[in-house]
């Protein structure tokens, strides 16, 4: 079983939001998943990104591969959470 981290679409017509899920790569986009590990809402300004970092790290260590979009979301979240160094 190849586990991937990818987006599962939810919401209404023209108002989507996405769940970040760990699932078998053979499952449908909105089908059965192993675990819900976050939420991504691109319609909010600024974008709403809520991730369960510990669970994402668990799945990555277990061999799960993130989709291109999830990898981009993880980079954005890491950049937003990084401490800013004060200017001297």
Curated annotation (Swiss-Prot):
One GO term describing the cellular component: small ribosomal subunit
Record GO biological process: translation
Gene3D superfamilies linked to this entry: 3.30.1320.10
InterPro entries assigned to the protein according to its UniProt record, in alphabetical order: Ribosomal_bS16 (IPR000307), Ribosomal_bS16_dom_sf (IPR023803)
Record key words, sorted: Ribonucleoprotein, Ribosomal protein
Pfam family, one: Ribosomal_S16
Molecular function per GO: structural constituent of ribosome
Family: Belongs to the bacterial ribosomal protein bS16 family.
HAMAP family cross-referenced by the UniProt entry: Ribosomal_bS16 (MF_00385)
Protein name: Small ribosomal subunit protein bS16
Organism the protein comes from: Anaeromyxobacter sp. (strain K)
Taxonomic lineage from the root: Bacteria, Pseudomonadati, Myxococcota, Myxococcia, Myxococcales
């Amino acid at each position: 079983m190849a586990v991937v981290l990818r987006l599962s679409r939810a919401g209404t017509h023209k108002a989507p939001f996405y769940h970040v899920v760990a699932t078998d790569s053979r499952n449908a986009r909105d089908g059965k998943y192993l675990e819900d590990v976050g939420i991504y809402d691109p319609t909010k300004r600024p974008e709403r990104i809520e991730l369960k970092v510990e669970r994402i790290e668990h799945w990555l260590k277990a061999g799960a591969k993130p989709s291109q979009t999830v990898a981009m979301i993880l980079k954005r979240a890491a950049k937003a959470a990084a401490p800013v160094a004060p200017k001297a």
